[in-house]
């Protein structure tokens, strides 16, 4: 699924214990959806902050989205996060409701290079217009990475 062990994954405790036991820890990876999404987003490639999964509760999720947007305004960092595939549509809806119209938002789905791969970066107001025209993506049950950056 283009994920990496430990990044938004429960493996960190196991890796830390291996270090404590003095065992050799050898990272092996394939393609990373986070890095591929960041590369394809067109957003700041020098600085990023990864937030893992956002809160499930809508009010908490909106608060964190606004905090990430404010952080991006201050630091010019690209803000990156993921979501459980069955909550993607709700997350996108929250983002479009609470983020500033000029904020850049990238949605990168099924980043494997296959026929279902879909990556798009637009300003929030352009996302809203596309959704109103029925041109928005269906993200339900699709693995996605989300990125934002303030201009």
Regions found by a protein language model. Name each.
Residues 1-10:
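Conserved Motif II region of HX4D acyltransferases
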Residues 3-4, 32-34, 55-58, 86-88, ...:
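Short, catalytically relevant binding-site loops at active-site mouths
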Residues 1, 51-52, 82-83:
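Thr-Gly-centered strand-to-loop micro-motif
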Residues 9-71:
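Class I SAM-dependent methyltransferase SAM-binding "motif I" and its flanking Rossmann-like core
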Residues 11, 74-151:
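A contiguous loop/helix-start segment that scaffolds small-molecule binding in enzyme catalytic cores
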């Amino acid at each position: 699924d283009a994920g990496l062990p430990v990044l938004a994954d429960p493996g960190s405790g196991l890796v830390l214990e291996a270090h404590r036991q003095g065992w050799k820890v050898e990272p092996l990876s394939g393609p990373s959806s986070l890095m591929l999404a960041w590369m394809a987003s067109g957003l700041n490639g020098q600085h990023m902050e990864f937030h893992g999964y956002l809160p499930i509760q809508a009010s908490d999720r909106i608060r964190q989205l606004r905090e990430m947007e404010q952080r991006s305004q201050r630091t010019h960092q690209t803000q990156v996060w993921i979501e459980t595939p069955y909550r993607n549509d709700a997350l996108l809806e929250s983002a479009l409701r609470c983020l500033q119209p000029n904020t850049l938002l990238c949605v990168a789905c099924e980043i494997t290079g296959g026929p279902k791969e879909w990556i798009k970066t637009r300003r929030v107001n352009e996302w809203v217009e596309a959704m109103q025209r029925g041109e928005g993506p269906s993200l339900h049950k699709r693995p996605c990475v989300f990125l934002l950056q303030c201009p």
